[in-house]
Amino acid sequence: MVEKPQAGALPAGTLCVRHLAFAYGRRTLWSDVCFEAHAGSVTAILGNNGTGKSTLMNCIAGILKPRAGSVTLDGADVLALTRRERARLIAYVAQRFESASTSVYDTVLLGRLPYFAARPSARDYEIVETTLRDLGIASWADRDASTLSGGEGQRVMLARAIAQQPKVLLLDEPTASLDLGSRVETLRYVRAYAKRCGVAVLMVSHDVNAALEVCSHLVLTDPKGFVQSVAADAVTDAQLSHTYGVSVRLRTLEDRRFVLAGD
């Protein structure tokens, strides 16, 4: 069962997922998944381990092939594009950070690869330097990326994705390895970046409270393949309790909603 988005013309920059299905062999992970991620806002995919959140992200990114359904951006079939064409539209930050022994600067410069042929242009270098500065990691430029901690590496990979200048940014648990201060700083940056640049951000998260703070919409999953999309400010105790299989209570403090789990 899936909540169907409303019919009608979609705003520019909308990532549209329709009737998506995926299976490992004979085991259907989920089917008939429908939701939208809108330009200028952040949407979170929530749920317990094993519900297919990362698999859903990989299907949208074109890494895995869905059994059925479509992924479109401004009417274009994302899954039918070449890898280079897709990289100009969608940037993906995976859950695990892996890097060769190259500088942080050169790692971020790889985000410009879809745009240059033989070598980078002055504009490519300018974008890299601006991105490093905006994320507060310009001082890391000459560091060996392979020596970074997990949290530092995630910030560098986020910088590389932003340097791609995508229309859609996919983030798989972008704050999993970050300390509290870096987590807050990164999420606020992502929200501001989405709004400023008109990018649709879709992220997998295990942090419900963080999702409630920065996201406009939530995509809720469960082990039985049930997926629904709901506005973050309209999600209910019952919906979150069903998603996580535990009693969840929503509370408000200083105009911020947060969850308490358990009876």
Question: Which residue ranges define each predicted feature?
Answer:
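Conserved structural motif at the start of ABC-family nucleotide-binding domains
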Residues: 15, 29-32
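Conserved ABC transporter NBD signature motif
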Residues: 69-77, 86
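Helix-to-loop junction immediately C-terminal to a conserved catalytic motif
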Residues: 61
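The feature captures the beta-strand-to-loop junction immediately N-terminal to the Walker
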Residues: 46-48
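Catalytic Walker B motif of ABC-type/P-loop ATPase nucleotide-binding domains
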Residues: 169-173
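Conserved ABC ATPase signature
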Residues: 144-148, 152
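Conserved ABC ATPase "signature" region
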Residues: 123-140
